[in-house]
Amino acid sequence: MVTPRSAVPAARPLAARRLASVAWACAALLALVALQCATATKDIVTMHATRNSLIPKDTLTVAVVMIDSYDNRLVFHANKNLLFGASNTSARALAEAYNLLGEVYVTYAYYRWARDDRPVAVGRPAPDYVLGTRLLSGPGSQKIKPPEERPSFPLSGSLRGKSLLMPRKVIFNDPLQTLMPFVFTRYLSITLSGYWDISVNSGKNVFSLCVSSPATPPVEVIATPRSAKLRESRFPQWPRYLYVSSSETSVLVNVAAGTSYKPRLYNATLAGVKAFLEVQNYGSHVAAGQLLTIKQLLKHGCNREPDEPFVVAAALHFGAAWHRFAALAAETYVTDAEILEFVVTTETWAKQVELCFSANAPQLGAAPPASRLAILSGRGGADEGLINVPYAILQVSRERYWGEVRSVNEQLTILTAILGSVDRLGAAAYLPSADGVAPHAFAASIIDSYYHKLIRGSATDKIDRKTLSAAVRVFLARKADSIPTARRVLTHMTVLCSEHQAQNPLVDITGTIDAASGHGEIFCLDDLFTPCAAALRFDLEPQANRPSGNVISASAVYRTLYGSFLYGGSELETAALLDDSARVIAAAQPVGGPKAYADMFFPELARCFDWTRENSIVFYIAISDSASWILTTRPVTGGVRYRLPDTSIRTNLYLTYFNASCSKEPFASRVEKITSGYVNLHGASIACKLCGHALLRYSLGGFEDVFVIRTADEERQMTMGANSSIQYFRAMDPTYFNYILMDSSGSALRVLAFTHGSYAVDKNYIIGIAVGSLAGVFAVAFAARSIYKFYRGRANRYTLLTNDYD
């Protein structure tokens, strides 16, 4: 149990802080020159300020560097008269008055807020089993490769050690001047710039994090060993900063003083500091930060009101994950595959937070805000090799024949390398492999493979979900050259977005995260992927009360944070597990929509559909290379339109066919009546008469799902009923569901039953056949009677004639 000395930030007047920042920056630059000539053996060395009696009274000495027994005096003199004005002038008096008022305000704020201080309990740190195991076992007989050596394939055997990070001595120049400058061994430096500016320094036993934005006060966290005697910049009469410590580490927290006390900010910061001290595994920090992000989304959506407590807590997990990962790499080893997964996951996570939780979050259909993530920028000496690992792996993987890659792990590695390189390389990340297979084709083949497995009810595990998710992201990250392939891929995802796929254990959000956290594994949003996340289905609403309403319990989060689209919704059970039973994504703002996909891959819809009624779209799919079917809740113009019968009075569904001609004839303005008929399921059709047809299923409550028949095997499976290997056909129940059969020419047939008569028989056709047959019977009878009478008449006439001659 540790009691913080004070839970209040220290602040200086704005002008004084700016001047001090300039002074410390200059001192740090000059001190770096001295460090090049000094050799230090300690991890942390303090830098003391001094005053020389020979220096004029109005001159301020900033710093003198002392490293071990070497007394390298580096003096920087600043003239107070130049900085604050000459003595006995109004400018100097005003500056001193501002400074005095600042001291009085901060002292009063400390006194007022310190009454709310509570003990901070820091538990015993949980051991990092990965680090412990590697310290005991070591890399074994495998050689640790230096950064300049190319990684091998598969990546499990390519190990890297301390040379990856290139640790070196640098001066820590505190942006908020919480501590006087000191020297430490830095492993890496991370800078995130955008609406939120976040800087992280990680070194041997030293960690620092600073978070700031235009609308919030800066927050700083500095962790150092308890044995380090570091000087603080506070005035002696001030209480200390927020101070939390464990058995080996002390943490200073500095929040710039604002106009009001923010308990949520302090609570979030304390929780993040406790997690930093208690959790030693980098994967656990990534999992905890992702869970925090998901909770924030489920509660508030992608709001444009900056939530500093959440961002500070997420940033602490982000920085702690990198700090622990750097320690693992420096003290033992990490594999190229681990570097690849960690770098891509944390980069994606940082972009998602910037995209969804900043004041400049994009409006509907707008481009994402500009942001930049720099890892190991090289300032002060950190190697660039870490962020180049994804590209190095991509280069190695291109030498393989992607068309022959069947291992799920290798597929995931290649896809992740592409995702980790696309921001830096752009179109160069989409160059083909040695056998000419481009990333779009590679991703599409993986999606096709999983589609054929999933429609047959095959279960998926974590690696399968991550691979399918990565394939979809690679395919959609840049516009595909082949529009027919893109239409097929999106139709696959729409077919898979059904109630049956919702039974996949993948929707267990908390179970997935807890399993990852408990084993020290990295959790990312790819672990929550469902086909609905990339489906052309837009009826996923929080108010939906139907059997298929739970298909979005995981995909809604994925849709939002991966920049696709979101129309909200989740199971109340899942929301309760996530401590949010009141609001479930209801406030979420979509960052894309049906029109975005139509503009890219469905030109007939982009040109012909009335986009003023975009909100009425339930789903759309491609039925051919140039035609589509779209289901809406309101009638639309521009195509052949049908109203679905037998829905509730509160649910109106309209099915419309669009092709390149954009029908504007008068018939297109009226609603066509869907004829009813029977579909034969007897035997398999060698010609595959149903290929290119779609079967839509709906009930009294609304749309359920859709299936597109593409192959003769799928048509044969349709005939097998409960024995079919395809889940959609096994669940067919015409007594409860209604089915609409749609073809590629714009015709729609309501299926009354599946019989063994003819391929597709309309009831009017049956009546016509019956009437025609009956008429034929009468005609035959009449003809027979006429012939009989004719011949009998001729026979009688012949007899009479014979009698006459006789």
UniProtKB/Swiss-Prot annotation:
Signal peptide interval: 1-40
Membrane topology annotation: Single-pass type I membrane protein
Keywords of this entry: Fusion of virus membrane with host cell membrane, Fusion of virus membrane with host membrane, Glycoprotein, Host cell membrane, Host endosome, Host membrane, Membrane, Sialic acid, Signal, Transmembrane, Transmembrane helix, Viral envelope protein, Viral penetration into host cytoplasm, Virion, Virus entry into host cell
Virion surface side: 41-764
Residue positions with a glycan: 88, 267, 659, 723
Subcellular location: Virion membrane; Host cell membrane; Host endosome membrane
GO biological process annotation, one example: fusion of virus membrane with host plasma membrane
InterPro entries the UniProt entry points to: Herpes_gH, Herpes_glycoH_C, Herpes_glycoH_C_sf
Main location: virion
Free-text function comment from the UniProt entry: The heterodimer glycoprotein H-glycoprotein L is required for the fusion of viral and plasma membranes leading to virus entry into the host cell. Following initial binding to host receptor, membrane fusion is mediated by the fusion machinery composed of gB and the heterodimer gH/gL. May also be involved in the fusion between the virion envelope and the outer nuclear membrane during virion morphogenesis.
Subunit structure: Interacts with glycoprotein L (gL); this interaction is necessary for the correct processing and cell surface expression of gH. The heterodimer gH/gL seems to interact with gB trimers during fusion.
Protein name: Envelope glycoprotein H
Organism from which the protein derives: Psittacid herpesvirus 1 (isolate Amazon parrot/-/97-0001/1997) (PsHV-1)
Lineage: Viruses, Duplodnaviria, Heunggongvirae, Peploviricota, Herviviricetes
